[in-house]
């Protein structure tokens, strides 16, 4: 594993089911630089709730010809490789990933992850720790909230700044990291 490298990940779902991924965005960060991005719409093969559409703006017709998760997942894993994954509110995103992998009948990969929301709560003094509020805390421009690629970029920028308070990324993953396999 490269010393200071990680992948920031974000999902949007079509409805309340954790298996209804309709968009995925990821950014790879190596030595404090975003080096690669990954973004795709995903056909959830499920209904869209009006509540979720209001959040992310993705309509059923937007994903009609999009690949399904079983097609996208191998490309996601190739992008992630052996890097740790970070998500802002990882409890949601990692449950989405875990349940979607189970739904397509594949084994859960050995994947280390941590949560930038929880790391922020342990690291900085802010009145709120949501993605938008942390971007404001660090005085960073933030446009397109609930667009998976923009949210993954925001998560990466926040994480990079939070990591400056620690010895290195390995230290953070050893203390706060979890493994997707443990969701069992």
Regions found by a protein language model. Give the residues of each.
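Acidic, divalent-metal-coordinating active-site segment for phosphoryl/phosphodiester hydrolysis
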Residues: 147-160
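Short, acidic/small-residue loops that bind anionic groups at enzyme active sites
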Residues: 108-116, 120
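Acidic two-metal-ion nuclease catalytic site recognized across multiple nuclease folds
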Residues: 1, 157-184
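Conserved non-catalytic scaffold segment of RNase H-like nuclease domains
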Residues: 1-111, 125-128, 132-146
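Active-site phosphate/pyrophosphate-handling residues
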Residues: 95, 118, 153
């Amino acid at each position: 594993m490269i010393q200071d490298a990680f992948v920031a990940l974000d999902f949007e779902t079509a409805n309340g089911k954790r298996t209804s991924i309709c968009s995925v965005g990821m950014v790879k960060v190596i030595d404090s630089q975003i080096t690669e991005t990954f973004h795709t719409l995903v056909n959830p093969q499920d209904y869209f709730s009006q509540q979720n559409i209001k959040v992310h703006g993705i309509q059923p017709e937007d994903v009609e010809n999009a690949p399904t998760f079983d097609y996208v997942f191998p490309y996601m894993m190739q992008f992630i490789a052996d890097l740790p994954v970070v998500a802002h509110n990882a409890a949601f995103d990692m449950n989405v990933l875990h349940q979607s992998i189970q739904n397509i009948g594949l084994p859960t990969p050995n994947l280390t992850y941590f949560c930038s929301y929880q790391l922020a709560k342990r690291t900085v003094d802010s009145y709120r720790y949501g993605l938008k509020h942390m971007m404001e805390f660090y005085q960073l421009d933030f446009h397109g909230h609930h667009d998976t690629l923009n949210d993954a970029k925001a998560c990466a920028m926040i994480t990079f700044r939070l990591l400056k308070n620690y010895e290195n990324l390995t230290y953070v993953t050893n203390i706060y990291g979890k493994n997707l396999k443990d969701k069992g």
